[in-house]
Every structure is written in structure tokens, then in C-alpha cells.
Amino acid sequence: MLIVKEITDKNTWEEFFEDIEDKTFLQSWNWGEFQKRMSNKIWRLGVFEGENLITLALVVKIQAKRGTFLLVQHGPTIKNSKFQIPNSKFQIFKVLLEELKKVGKNEGASFIRISPLLKDNEENRKILNELGFREAPMHANAYEATWKLDITPSEEELLSKMRKTTRYLIRKTKKDPTISIKKSESLEDLKIYEKLTQMVAKRQSFVPFSFEFIKNEFEVFLKDKKVLCFLGNYKDEPVAGALVIFWSGVGFYHQAASNEKYAKLSIPYQVLWTAIVEAKKRNCKWFDFWGYVDPFKYPNHPWAGPTLFKMGFGGEKKEYVKTQDYPLNFSYLKNWTIEKVRKKKRKI
């Protein structure tokens, strides 16, 4: 028999993810703490088969102008094990959905949005479809495909498998005495990084994360020493940066920005390589470059250029089922229409 309970112990939550391959920090305990800092209500739900914890879902209540909804980013996460129940994946999603529907109705939500890291195949799409989910008009502010690199080989092996140009630029910037990389846990350096993001946002005409968002994310993960701000300097001037999270054996290249004025110096290559080396030092097995789109199939997509840059470091693509919505009432239609228009405007 499957039952759903709230999880209140951090260690129980974090240990669950140790043997999970497809995971991101958007389902971590600390991300829940971050959401609370952002004044969002959360639920940490676990599905049990008897005494065994087999599924987790960090659920966040989002209150937006277009409507209120429940969000499960990069979850629910199902543990790979020998279940006693037939058709286990379907049954797990079903019992969890029933709990989410209760929460959603109590909170006045118009829909439930999930983006589980399940392989994008017919079996998984069928399960979600049969439960009443429908493909969302936009992704849940988190990727549906990413580029990942196994970083267990030596540094030299990793370099040897990179694109020739990428390897050359890493070595070139490493030797350049005018270029230096700083690894920081300082809020002052985070402010410098945030200025770079504002510069990129203005150049590319998009709304960046607020400093409150970046600061809260940084401080929450910093408590456990699981985040660093990387700054690439040219003659002591910060011209590139990245915010990297190290969680559950994975390094996440969550955010990055650079000053276009210094593009020819190729400093972002050294920033990213330094982050990968740091992830290795922290015994991470994988490095997640955070987001992927086929740059050859969709050359005009906003992520096409960044994806080409990431691919140069070696690795492989990981594609998951599309973000899914479960409507709870007719007001979902308003949200669907607004997001459909936004997607068209953003050309994504």
C-alpha cells in the first residue's frame, strides 16, 4: 500500500538522493529553505511503500498575477528499486497526484505543474497523459533538457575529449598573466556578479533574477558550503562570472554572465573550467551545464549559442518529458493563454 507523508527531517530527505542519477538542487532541502525565504509556502512530500521511502516531491505554492498554482520543479523523484506493487510508476504518480489535488484545492490553486526528470519516451508520456496531465505552454523556469559531463576522469582526460578550440582557449587563458579567476563566498563579490547579470539582461532584453533571488539562493546554500561565486578578472576588472552549486555529487552551472566588451579574451572558458575542477575537488561525479537546446536544429533559439559553448567541454545531452500541467478549475485557461503568448514573444 502506498501512503503520502510530509518529510520533516533534512537528513532523510538528502540521503534519498544519494543514489539518484537524474536530479537537481531544485528538489534539495535547501531549495525548499530558499523558497521559504522568498515567501513561498512549501510542502515536502514523501511516498512510502510500507516503511520504504520511494518518492519525494518538493512542492511550492506560486502566487502570480496570472493565477495561483502548485509547482514541482524537476520532480517528483522516484527511487529506482524493486517495488512490490504492479504498474508502480503510474500508481506512485496517482497517489501523489491525489494529495496534490487536495493541497491545491485548499490553497486556491488553479492548476498543478510538474517537471519530473523522466526520460522523454512513450511509456512516461503515456503515464502522465492517462493521469490527466497535459503539456504546459512553457517550461517551469527550469530546463527540460540539459548537457552533462562525467567528471570522474582526470583533468588531462577531460581536456583531451573537449572540442579543440575549447581546449586551446582554456590553456591560453590559463597562461595569460592579465587574467585571473576568483572563487568567492563573499556577498560583495556576489554584488559584482549581479551587476554583470544586469548588463547581460539589458543587452539581450530579458528580465534577470533579482538581487534578492540571487542573494537568498547564495546564502541558503552557503550555510552548507555548497555554493561558490566565480569571477573572471582582466587586469583586476571583473568581466565574467558564474554561480555554481555543488549538491549531491553534482556541480551545477546554474547562472553565468559576462561583459561583451571583453568577449575576445574568452575568459568565460577559464571560469567554467575552474568550476569543473572545483567540482572534481569536491568529489562530484557529474557536472550539469544547466540547459540544452539542439543548436543545429534550433539555431535562432536564445539558448543555441550558450549550448554550443557548453558542448565544447565534452559531455552528453539528457532529454526529459516536457513540463506537465494538471488543471484544477477553469481559471487555468487564463494562465494557459498568457503563457502561450509569452512563449511566442520570447521565441522559445
Give short role names for the model-derived ranges.
Residues 95-99, 103, 216-329:
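Aromatic (often tryptophan-rich) hydrophobic motifs at membrane interfaces
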Residues 77-78, 118-119, 293-297:
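Short histidine/acidic/glycine/proline-rich micro-motifs that form metal-
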Residues 5-50, 56-66, 116-121, 133-140, ...:
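A conserved beta-strand-loop-helix scaffold within acyl/acetyltransferase catalytic domains
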Residues 67-80, 107-113:
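Glycine-/proline-rich flexible loop or hinge segments
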